[in-house]
Amino acid sequence: MCGILATLLADGDGHCVGDLVDGMTVLQHRGQDAAGFTTASTSQDWEKVTFKTVKGTGMVREVFADPKRAQELLGNVGIAHVRYPTAGGSGLDDVQPFYANFPCGLALAHNGNLTNSERLRKELVSRHRHLNTTSDSEALLNVFAEHLAANLEARRRGSVGHAGDPLSTPVSPDTLFDAVERTMRRCVGGYAVVVLVHNVGV
């Protein structure tokens, strides 16, 4: 049992970190082991946007004991996670949100368990995907990244006169939702997920 949250402020110049911290404090009963937050801004040129992440072990108030940590999380869109470890390790490396940079910036927070995580991990490693943790959440993120990359490549090839790699192809709702559907078919179990997608949102 973990807690996850996503927020998007209509004001592109706003900062959602306060809402995320408040929300995760309310959800603290769902996980007291660790907390993590990732934010971005939709007001900037998306090519210049970077994800900002703060993670730590302990309660939300302990992660943000130093007020400067909250100042690192600029942006009007974000996701957050409080952990109650049921799968994977319990160290700092296992604190969510997890991040992948291909085919675009992706940050994921997940609650639940994948019953086929070992099989997924073996499939991912056989395709030269590097996994840093034993968390089923990281496997889920990489499965989603694979499907999104495949969809972007198929879209790029189908676009007349559209040259370049998958990174030059914008993520459309169709490519995104199809990747979600394919991911959910492959990842067996009971779970909820929020994903921050670069150049798209939550």
Spell out what each predicted region is:
Residues 1-202:
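Conserved short alpha-helical segments that host acidic/polar catalytic motifs at enzyme active sites
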